[in-house]
């Protein structure tokens, strides 16, 4: 980065492992460029490596396996325009690598399992998003990612999913209560008995009353749009689109 920003905007993106956070943000960073946006994976603040977690009988989702004090101090420093020496968690080896220098940037996105868990970190954020992925979709995505990108076996992935589920319910899922926007991804209702998970149902839920953030209005409130491609012909492989906009209650919020 060549110019020090006048103000650092801090965005938090929370969600379970394998829900698409890193993939989405890598593409966002490619779009805006490194001179404008920096993405930090909060896995880098694991205080225990993979072997140590196994020996201690804890998962990476457990707060005991993460250094929230260092996370808070370094994110606060970046927000104040200061550079940091951030640790690196190596997903391939499961080890903690030597730190790297991170400079402040116009937009810094902190993504991972716990950006909304610690109140101190949460209060630093200017805006927050929680990715709420259904179990059916999450399992399909995580198997694809961990086997292709991280060298895990199918059995290892399934075992990890089952062992992490209690900690997800205890430490990760409750964070959506604090998010400004929740993006829910569920299996489609347009294809009967869909198993490929290539067509998905997506809901974007925006909290009312967030300062400086106006909700997106796609069409009139209460409207529903149905589009069936090709009419009754059988030449289209895609099922179409169904859209609805209107008020709702989610996790106790309107």
Cite the ranges covered by each PLM segment.
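C-terminal accessory "lid"/substrate-recognition subdomains
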Residues: 2, 107, 123, 135, ...
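Hydrophobic positions on the alpha1 helix immediately C-terminal to the Walker A/P-loop
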Residues: 24, 28
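Short hydrophobic/aromatic beta-strand immediately N-terminal to the Walker A/P-loop
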Residues: 10-12
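Conserved lysine of the Walker
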Residues: 21
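Phosphate-binding P-loop
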Residues: 2-8
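The conserved Walker
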Residues: 17
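Conserved nucleotide-sensing/catalytic segment adjacent to the nucleotide-binding pocket
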Residues: 35-41, 47-93, 107
């Amino acid at each position: 980065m060549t110019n020090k920003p006048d103000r650092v905007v801090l965005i938090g993106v929370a969600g379970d492992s394998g829900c698409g956070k890193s993939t989405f943000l890598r593409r966002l960073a490619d779009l805006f460029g490194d001179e404008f946006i920096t993405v930090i994976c909060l896995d880098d603040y694991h205080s225990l490596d993979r072997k140590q977690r196994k020996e201690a009988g804890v998962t990476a989702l457990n707060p005991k396996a993460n250094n929230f004090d260092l996370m808070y101090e370094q994110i606060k420093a970046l927000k104040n325009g200061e550079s940091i020496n951030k640790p690196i968690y190596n997903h391939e080896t499961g080890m903690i690598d030597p730190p790297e220098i991170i400079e402040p940037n116009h937009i810094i996105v902190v993504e991972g399992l716990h950006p909304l868990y610690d109140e101190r970190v949460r209060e630093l954020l200017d805006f927050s998003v929680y990715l709420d992925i259904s179990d059916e979709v999450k399992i399909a995505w995580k198997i694809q990612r961990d086997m292709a990108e991280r060298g895990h076996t199918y059995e290892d992935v399934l075992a990890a999913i089952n062992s992490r589920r209690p900690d997800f319910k205890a430490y990760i899922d409750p964070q959506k209560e604090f998010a400004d926007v929740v993006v829910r991804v569920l299996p489609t209702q347009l294809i009967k008995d869909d198993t490929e998970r290539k067509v998905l149902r997506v809901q974007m839920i925006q909290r009312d009353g967030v300062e400086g953030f106006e909700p997106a209005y796609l069409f009139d409130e209460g409207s529903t749009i149905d589009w069936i491609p090709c009419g009754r012909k059988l030449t289209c492989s895609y099922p179409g689109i169904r859209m609805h906009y209107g008020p709702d209650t989610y996790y106790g919020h309107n």
